[in-house]
A protein has these predicted regions:
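Cysteine-nucleophile amide-bond enzymes
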Residues: 23, 27-279
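Sec-dependent N-terminal signal peptides of Gram-positive bacterial secreted proteins and lipoproteins
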Residues: 4-25
Length: 279
């Protein structure tokens, strides 16, 4: 049976769980278009590093992550990347030369498939997310994440952090319904059972795209299909930090508002219509 997926959005910040629902928000006409960077130049890296530190992310964590970014960009020879600063987005998301990027990546990395969105987001947020009960995790969908961590050039997480990572991004059993509130309540209950908490000592937020997969009326799951970290800037805007996929680039996008971010994510990942799944 085919796997049906549709999206709901979860904003996880300072122990608050709230759902973004498609159609409830839209980008105001007077707002500037989002602009994105792949951190291929020193200036953009300094800007993002400053925003991370201001949000409470440690210099050690930020610098280690930026080292990963520089290494990745060098490996793919800056293919399809924004070479300097930030570039305004068009009506459609940026397009990357996946074929050339993949060839360049595989030329250097035989076993390591790269870091993805979940590994990147948790790496930045790991000091502020605590999991009290890791025994209830269902990491069945994280087989590629596990492979990436196993074959990474350096050990990314400690044993305790690895268990926390798998708990946070665990598959959650849900009901056969299109009601987003029902799925949100089930997701919140799962976090409560796992004793997952997000510290108030950071202004950074973990933003996750939660997929509802329906195999049948009795087999339904929720899973974080994409995630990133949102940090505020000094001029009251937001930077959304994400790794697009294992082999695709790091991307940092500047948004005028959280509503603009929601519209961006819906445009990227809301790809099904008329399915028996929640939106």
């Amino acid at each position: 049976m085919s796997k049906k997926k549709i999206l709901c959005y979860v904003l996880l910040t300072a122990m608050l769980v709230s759902m973004f629902v498609a159609g409830e928000v839209s980008v105001a006409a007077e707002q500037q278009k989002p602009a994105y960077s792949n951190l291929a130049d020193v200036k953009s890296r300094k800007e993002v590093r400053s925003a991370l530190l201001s949000a409470g992310i440690s210099a050690k964590t930020a610098d280690a992550w930026l080292k990963d970014v520089v290494s990745y960009n060098k490996t793919i020879k800056n293919t399809s990347l924004v070479k300097k600063n930030f570039k305004k987005m068009g009506k459609k998301p940026p397009v990357y030369n996946e074929n050339r990027i993949s060839k360049l990546w595989l030329k250097k990395n035989k076993l390591f498939i790269g870091y993805n969105c979940r590994i990147t987001a948790y790496d930045l947020m790991k000091d502020y997310i605590k999991v009290g009960n890791t025994g209830k995790a269902n990491p069945s969908q994280l087989f590629m994440d596990r492979d990436a961590l196993k074959n990474a050039p350096t050990k990314k997480f400690s044993g305790k952090q690895r268990k926390a990572f798998e708990s946070i991004f665990s598959t959650v059993q849900t009901k056969y319904t299109k009601n987003v509130a029902t799925h949100a309540a089930i997701w919140a209950k799962d976090w409560k059972n796992k004793k997952i908490s997000v510290s108030c000592d950071t202004q950074a937020s973990l933003i996750s795209v939660v997929l509802h997969s329906s195999f049948s009326k009795t087999e339904n799951e929720l899973f974080v299909g994409h995630t990133g970290v949102l940090v505020p800037t000094k001029n009251h805007k937001y930077l959304f930090i994400e790794k697009l996929s294992f082999q695709l680039p790091y991307q940092v996008t500047r948004f005028e508002s959280k509503e603009q971010l929601n519209d961006y994510l819906m445009g990227m990942y809301d790809t099904e219509w008329g399915q028996d799944t929640a939106k």
